[in-house]
């Protein structure tokens, strides 16, 4: 029975879209990692709580097939702030997040990072002293 569960989760992972703009923060990537860790032995993995496993699969399958989007349609594709889906995608992209983190740093910290000598930049004779 665990072989069937394993195959169902693999199929779900194949169907789940990857968002390349969110490197390391993508739900599809996280899901694949969790399935790989939960089914370490592949089809031979013994599942301690089969009911919980089935419930988790059903929940993820409903999300993937947009059951809730169809059940609760929205008049507009905007958030409560009025930001559109495309604007949200741009703001949450990894490049934008890194740029925002850079802007959050103070002037002093930014200057110190740029002009401080790094250990690998120092010649070996000076590093030993």
UniProtKB/Swiss-Prot annotation:
Q: Where in the cell is it found?
A: Mitochondrion matrix, Mitochondrion nucleoid; Mitochondrion
Q: Which residues form a coiled coil?
A: none
The source's superkingdom equals Eukaryota
Q: Which GO terms describe its biological process?
A: mitochondrial respiratory chain complex III assembly; positive regulation of mitochondrial translation; regulation of insulin secretion; regulation of oxidative phosphorylation; regulation of skeletal muscle cell differentiation
InterPro entries attached to this UniProt entry: UQCC2
Q: Which GO terms describe its cellular component?
A: mitochondrial inner membrane; mitochondrial intermembrane space; mitochondrial matrix; mitochondrial nucleoid; mitochondrion
Q: Which Pfam families match?
A: UQCC2_CBP6
Q: What is its main location?
A: mitochondrion
Q: What intrachain disulfides are recorded? A: none
Keywords of this entry: Mitochondrion, Mitochondrion nucleoid, Transit peptide
Give first and last residue of the transit peptide.
1-13
Q: Which PANTHER family match?
A: UBIQUINOL-CYTOCHROME-C REDUCTASE COMPLEX ASSEMBLY FACTOR 2 (PTHR34260:SF1)
Give the protein's biological function. Answer: Required for the assembly of the ubiquinol-cytochrome c reductase complex (mitochondrial respiratory chain complex III or cytochrome b-c1 complex). May play a role in the modulation of respiratory chain activities such as oxygen consumption and ATP production. May be involved in cytochrome b translation and/or stability.
Write down what this protein is called. Answer: Ubiquinol-cytochrome-c reductase complex assembly factor 2
Q: Which organism is it from?
A: Danio rerio (Zebrafish)
Lineage of the native species? Eukaryota, Metazoa, Chordata, Craniata, Vertebrata
Gene for this protein? Answer: uqcc2
């Amino acid at each position: 029975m665990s072989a069937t569960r394993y195959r169902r989760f693999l199929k779900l992972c194949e169907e789940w879209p990857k968002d390349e703009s969110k490197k390391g923060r993508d739900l599809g990537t996280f899901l694949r990692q969790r399935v790989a860790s939960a089914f370490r032995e592949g089809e031979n993995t013994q599942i301690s709580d089969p009911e919980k496993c089935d419930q988790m699969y059903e929940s993820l399958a409903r999300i993937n097939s947009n059951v809730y989007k169809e059940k609760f349609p929205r008049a507009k594709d905007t958030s409560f702030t009025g930001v559109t889906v495309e604007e949200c995608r741009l703001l949450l992209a990894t490049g934008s997040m890194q740029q925002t983190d850079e802007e959050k740093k103070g002037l002093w910290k930014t200057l110190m990072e740029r002009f401080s000598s790094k250990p690998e930049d120092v010649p070996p004779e000076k590093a030993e002293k």
